[in-house]
Amino acid sequence: MEEQATYRRIAVKIGSNVLTRSDGTLNVTRMSAIVDQVATLRHMGVEVILVSSGAVAAGRSMMRRRGVAPLDAVSERMLFSAVGQVRLINRYYDFFSDRSLTCGQVLTMKECFSTRHHYLNQRHCMNTMLAHGVIPIVNENDTISVTELMFTDNDELSGLIATMMECQALVILSNIDGVYDGNPDFPQSKVITDIAHTDVPNAASFIQKKKSSFGRGGMSTKFHIAQKVANEGCQVIIANGNREGILLDVVRGNRKVPYTLFHAAPQPVSSLKKWIAHSEGFAKGEIHVNEGASQALTGETASSVLPVGVTRIMGEFEKDDIVRIVAPDGTTIGYGRAAYSAAKARTVMGCKAKRPLVHYDYLYVE
């Protein structure tokens, strides 16, 4: 009898410290073990999307063996990524082929998520791949990404992919067992096994700011992304990718193995709101609101951004652009899609009985 899985579709982010050895070379033994687990999941009926780091680290190792001349940081990243991505995807292709599976490469950039059209086009591409039994392997296209518009790291990218593709779970494989209740280097520290969306403020106080050896991010980034994705209705698991069989353990719910599970919010948000939630980097302007509007927007009842509660419009945006909603103290309330241009918004600001500047259906509150 075939084993049935809890999830229909998952995204798996594999960190640089899982895929590379201390000298920066690819850990092909670990890659093969992860591919083995993905193959098992496919036989269980689970669709798997891989978000894989490792290209820059692999390219760095290869080029430094050749004695490459010193480069500026941007040129170095582009060179290492271009060389390393070929090596990385070739390894994946060979490993999956050995298991009678087909993988496909998806290179993307933050700008590719900036408009709803581009967002849906990417989703269609990956849905087509999955429908034909192809395992997408996603990475940021570091060769042409503009530094100012790069993802924080692949944790951020994996969160976008998981929500865009309506995954039931996002598994972030790192080099530690999860979120700890203290410094992971201290023996008395323990892994926090479960974090509900209501427990996030307490758990956040334990987060260390330290970054990984080869990646751009750290646990702080992972925690932030996990919190956001879980609030959007997708479970998030942070686990140690160096543990044997860890991917199968977390999918099967084996709690004898240490890992942190962020429980999904009971009410998932719409596909459109998921896109808006991850569009903060593309906000074209700001809508500042008064205290009454701020309380209404962050309360339990669904509320739109009404002109009567608006105190200031900043920036020049057009209808349907993403805008940031700002509280009186300067903090971000959320993001939404503008129903007016900035020029039109200024003419109705403070007025009653006008249609919303941002309707609730197009508003994501953080």
PLM region spans:
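C-terminal catalytic "cap/lid" subdomain
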Residues: M1-R77, S81-E366
